């Protein structure tokens, strides 16, 4: 491993100190808790939506979450290893065949639904152990 890769790995480990990032993929519904600073107050804001893209670039990894707010589509890009992220919770697994779900931008209502990925009983039992 070269020097830059080592430094990047150290920064990732430092960013993950004390928190875990779950495995998630495009199509999954996630709740991202973000630390927001307003003046001298600090609070946690939840942002729930569907992951439409994931970009794996080491320390520069990011993902885009899309939600419908008051009838309008809202997308937000999060840096995976940002210190502003308090936590990420996977609420629902989506069953999709694409890595980038940008086509959801043009769709609304029933056509924008994503099938739920059902886990077999064998895998569910193995995951809990």
From Swiss-Prot:
SUPFAM superfamilies named among the record's database cross-references: Translation proteins SH3-like domain
Keywords: Ribonucleoprotein, Ribosomal protein
A GO biological-process term: translation
Pfam family of the protein (one): Ribosomal_L19
NCBIfam families noted in UniProt: rplS_bact
Family in the record: Belongs to the bacterial ribosomal protein bL19 family.
Protein name per its UniProtKB record: Large ribosomal subunit protein bL19
Source species of the chain: Burkholderia mallei (strain ATCC 23344)
């Amino acid at each position: 491993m070269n020097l830059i890769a080592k430094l990047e790995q150290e920064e990732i480990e430092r960013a993950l100190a004390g928190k875990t990032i779950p495995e998630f993929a495009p199509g999954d519904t996630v709740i991202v808790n973000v630390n927001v600073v307003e003046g001298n107050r600090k609070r946690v804001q939840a942002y729930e939506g569907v992951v439409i893209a994931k970009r794996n670039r080491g320390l520069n990894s990011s993902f885009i979450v899309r939600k419908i707010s008051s009838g309008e589509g809202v997308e937000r890009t999060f840096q995976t290893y940002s210190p502003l992220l308090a936590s990420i919770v996977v609420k629902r697994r989506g069953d999709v065949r694409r890595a980038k779900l940008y086509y959801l931008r043009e769709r609304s209502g029933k056509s924008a639904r994503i099938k739920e990925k059902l886990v077999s009983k064998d895998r569910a039992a193995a995951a809990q152990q």
